[in-house]
Amino acid sequence: MLHKKYFRLALAILLATALTVGVVGQVAALEIRGGEGTVTIAQNEVIDDDLLVGAQNVVVDGTINGDLIVGGTNVTINGTVNGSLIMGGQVLNLNGKVAGTVYSGGTSLTIGPKAEIGRNLFYGGFSLTAEDGSLIKRDALVAGYQFVLGGEVGRDARVSAGALEINGKVGGDVIAEVGNPADVGQTSFMPFVVPGAPPMVQPGLRVGPEATIGGKLTYTSQVEQPGAIRAQPGGGIAFQTPMPGTQ
């Protein structure tokens, strides 16, 4: 079962994202878009300012020359953000390029095969999928039920998840707390599962044979899982059990 302190960390990321989306509209020099249905920033539209968008459905195909703060039930970013991205909602999709850092909380975030994050990724929620071809140039900090990495993290990945699958590349270290493969169906994140979320994968750690970890893999779990690590990290592997009272 996912450790309580990391469940709280995920909730903290979700709360911080929600509060930012909720109150940032009070800041001056900020363009605001909103509506009850769908708000679209067209492909040929360029916004030379920070932008706040809130709607049930949000699609950003254009260019934001500033920070983008967006909240909605379904959010898709296909365009370019030349600042940082703060994104909260249920079903989130990033297919474009973000020059800065991505701060995101929601039921699910999918980072598409052409997506690029210029700095760091912070995510809290149920499911994060980084597809083959995606790039996070610096670090990834993830707290949730599952993280499936098919793309690349340039530096370190710090993860607390019931399930962690690495099939892509991590340039630095992987520091992870992962669930027990025997704990199928025993997750504190069950209440977050909503329509549109990806299927739940089996708990535990899995490193595929095509994966690359340039640094050290350090993982904490109730049980050691050597058979699930099918690629040798450059810095070796360290396993440890949870400290008493952290579950």
Where are these regions (language model features)?
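Bacterial N-terminal signal peptides that target proteins for export
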Residues: L2-I13
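Residue-level detector of solvent-exposed, low-hydrophobicity positions
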Residues: L14-A16, T246
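C-terminal segment of classical bacterial N-terminal signal peptides
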Residues: T17-V27
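Soluble extramembrane regions of membrane proteins in the secretory/endomembrane system
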Residues: V27-Q247
